[in-house]
Amino acid sequence: MSEKIEGIIDDLLNVEENADAIAIIGKDGQIVTQTENWNVSNDLEIINELLNEKLALGEKGITSLSIQGIKYMIVENTEERKIGTNITGKGHVLICPIPIGGPGALIAYVNPRAGPRDLLFNVQEYAKKLINLI
């Protein structure tokens, strides 16, 4: 992993205290990096399926995904973002495709004390910084 990518992750974690873990998926569908407290390697297949899903107007698509054994209901699925919420209060996942609608992603685990939309702007901005790095 490059120092630039590491710096972007560190900056995001410093700006967003409710982002407890980060993973970055490259445009090739492989893990570029992830924070030590989160391992998405066993869940890459469903994450990549979600990232590569192209929905027509009115189509539902994937309705849930599990990461590290925690199930998240997909509450928003657009080219700009995928938001999943655990209905038992175990937090949220915010997936920002890189580039918008693309196969890479910045994925943030949002702790239960915050809502995913509280972090949305910053996570999307940091995802844009990764476009030419992954």
Swiss-Prot record:
Gene3D superfamilies, per the entry: Dynein light chain 2a, cytoplasmic
Loki loop as annotated region, ranges: 55-62
Subcellular localization: Cytoplasm, Cytoskeleton
Activity regulation as described: Inhibition of rabbit actin polymerization is reduced by phosphatidylinositol-(4,5)-P2(1,2-dipalmitoyl), a soluble form of the phospholipid phosphatidylinositol, suggesting an unknown lipid might regulate actin-profilin interaction in vivo.
Gene Ontology terms for molecular function: actin binding
Main location: cytoplasm
Family: Belongs to the Asgard profilin family.
Domain-level remarks: The Loki loop (specific to some members) becomes ordered on binding to rabbit actin.
Function of the protein: Binds to actin and affects the structure of the cytoskeleton. At high concentrations inhibits spontaneous rabbit actin nucleation. This strongly suggests this archaea has a profilin-regulated actin system, and actin-type genes can be identified in this organism.
Name assigned to this protein: Loki profilin-2
Organism per entry: Lokiarchaeum sp. (strain GC14_75)
